[in-house]
Design a protein with these regions (language model features):
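All-alpha prenyltransferase/terpene-synthase fold signal
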Residues: 1-143
Length: 143
């Protein structure tokens, strides 16, 4: 079972009913991130896609259900990390979620990919700077 299949299965019945059959393997490799972090990254990324782009694992949701499903997947991912006592990852993904919202609200959706790359890197054995560090100089309002 792929991480995206697991994400669909972990959703409530209303959202899971919109899951695509046989979703792709996903973006995040369990061999690189570990099973829990890979599941969480996939869940949170799918939540992001439901809010801002085309989801990979779900189809046929109306606009309201897309937003609710996206929020539910954010919560699912963060809750799974909290159950695993992975507070570093909870903090990183909380930053990522809010910074992606900031990037889209400020008209810079292209920055979201940088944020995702930074978060995926810091949550892998390679480590590195996280999402907040990657945009630290750009958080001030532009005039």
């Amino acid at each position: 079972m792929t991480a995206l299949s697991e994400v669909i299965a972990a959703c409530d019945a209303t959202v899971a009913a919109h899951g695509v059959p046989n979703p792709s393997a996903g973006r995040f490799d369990p061999a690189e991130h570990g099973a829990v972090r890979a599941f969480v990254l996939e869940a949170v990324y799918e939540g992001y896609l439901l809010h801002y782009a085309t989801p990979r694992a779900f189809q046929g949701l109306d606009e309201d259900l897309r937003l609710l499903a996206g929020d539910a997947l954010y919560a699912l991912g963060l809750a799974r990390l909290a159950e695993d006592d992975d507070l570093e990852a909870v903090g990183e993904l909380a930053d990522l979620i809010s910074l992606c919202a900031w990037a889209h609200a400020e008209g810079h959706p292209e920055r979201a990919e940088e944020l995702w790359e930074a978060s995926a890197r810091i949550l892998s054995p390679a480590g590195g700077a996280g999402a907040a560090a990657s945009v630290a100089g750009n958080l001030a309002p532009q005039r």
